[in-house]
Amino acid sequence: MFIDKIKAKANNDEINVIIEIPMNIGPIKYEFDKESGAVFVDRFMQTTMSYPCNYGFIPHTLSNDGDPVDVLVVAHHPVVPGSVIKCRAVGVLMMEDESGLDEKIIAVPTSKLDITFDHIKELDDLCEMLKKRIVHFFEHYKDLEKGKWVKVTGWENKAKANALINEGIDRAS
């Protein structure tokens, strides 16, 4: 995959997300290597948990932790690692871990990909149980890994998510 050819934004309202970890596939953490374009197994998580959403990043962005901006893509199906999915941001999960601040943009597929998410405009439109599952996952997925921890500090709205995306684009350029 030539990541250089994939833009951060498909248009003003849509972001391109490169999927690293499919939802509900088991306790495996994959990482996309930006230089080679390969997906590597980063580690086998010690908890028996799987990601509640497809997990990836926005190319050509840089968050405060030095990595590309992270995104959780709410979907009905797992998406293959390395796939690019066009999404709309609806909010952000605010958290910190042993390395510092680590926000996760929450996004849904665009109408062209799945019309069943058209009614979700903001974070409050998501099912409350899904939000609880996301928080539970991130509060516990590192529990059995020595020296690792996560603290979820709350949720922010779509405007904050878009601000973090734009800051990430600016920081990377």
From Swiss-Prot:
| Residues annotated for Mg(2+) 2 binding in this entry | 70
Q: What is its EC number?
A: 3.6.1.1
UniProt GO molecular function: inorganic diphosphate phosphatase activity; magnesium ion binding
Q: Which GO terms describe its biological process?
A: phosphate-containing compound metabolic process
Its needed co-factors are: Mg(2+)
Give the UniProt keywords, A-Z: Cytoplasm, Hydrolase, Magnesium, Metal-binding
Where, by residue number, does Mg(2+) 1 bind?
Answer: 65, 70, 102
State the compartments where it is located.
Cytoplasm
- Which family is annotated? Belongs to the PPase family.
- Please give the function described in this protein's UniProt entry: Catalyzes the hydrolysis of inorganic pyrophosphate (PPi) forming two phosphate ions.
Q: How does it assemble?
A: Homohexamer.
Q: Which NCBIfam families match?
A: PRK01250.1
Record protein name field: Inorganic pyrophosphatase
Give the organism the record lists: Rickettsia felis (strain ATCC VR-1525 / URRWXCal2) (Rickettsia azadi)
Gene name of this polypeptide? ppa
